A protein has these predicted regions:
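Extracellular modular ligand-binding repeats in secreted and cell-surface proteins
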Residues: 1-80, 142
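Solvent-exposed, well-ordered loop and adjacent helix/strand elements within mature globular domains
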Residues: 58-170
Length: 170
């Protein structure tokens, strides 16, 4: 029986910090069975008792306190609260399965990125070195976890190569 992971929000700890409060432990189901043999072969099988040892949840403390930081960029000084390492690819409205409108109704193109909403909330403002300011305004079938897709007006002439980069949530 697999253990579950629980998160406990901690308003006194910075939002980017997580720590394990309790390790998880899988549970067990133990069945005691009486097997009756006749001439050396199994003749009957009876369950005598079943015992369940419940799993112990893994508990992770997750900071929720926003601590603002500043950084100089070619666009000027920005204030951010979280730095994330992501794998950044690129797309435009002409890619297979794409169109002119994003998941939240914005026009696809430069300044709009596709994200996994479980990792980066839709409508979040983001700064991406080498790309600039953007809004998390789209999702995509291949965008899972720490992968983002940078929107361009024309991906063929964007000059962006897929790579790991640090981005900043504003």
């Amino acid at each position: 029986i697999k253990f579950e992971t629980e998160y406990k929000d901690d308003p006194e700890t910075e939002a980017v910090i997580e720590s394990i409060l309790q390790e998880g432990e899988d549970g067990k189901k133990i069945t005691t069975t009486k097997i009756t043999l006749y001439d050396g072969e199994e003749f009957d099988k009876d369950i005598i008792k079943t015992e369940t040892i419940d799993p112990k949840s893994k508990i992770i403390s997750r900071g929720t306190k926003i601590v603002w930081k500043t950084m100089q960029t070619p666009e000027g000084e920005i204030r951010y609260w979280k730095k994330m390492r992501v794998y950044a690819t690129h797309y435009d409205s002409r890619c297979p399965g794409c169109n002119d409108w994003t998941a939240i109704g914005m026009r696809a193109g430069k300044g709009v990125i596709a994200v996994d909403p479980k990792v980066i909330k839709l409508r979040s403002n983001v700064y991406i070195p080498g790309y600039g300011l953007a809004v998390a305004g789209d999702t995509g079938g291949a965008i899972k976890g720490n992968i983002i897709d940078l929107g361009f007006d024309d991906a063929r002439t964007a000059g962006w190569s897929a790579k790991f980069i640090d981005i900043y949530l504003l």
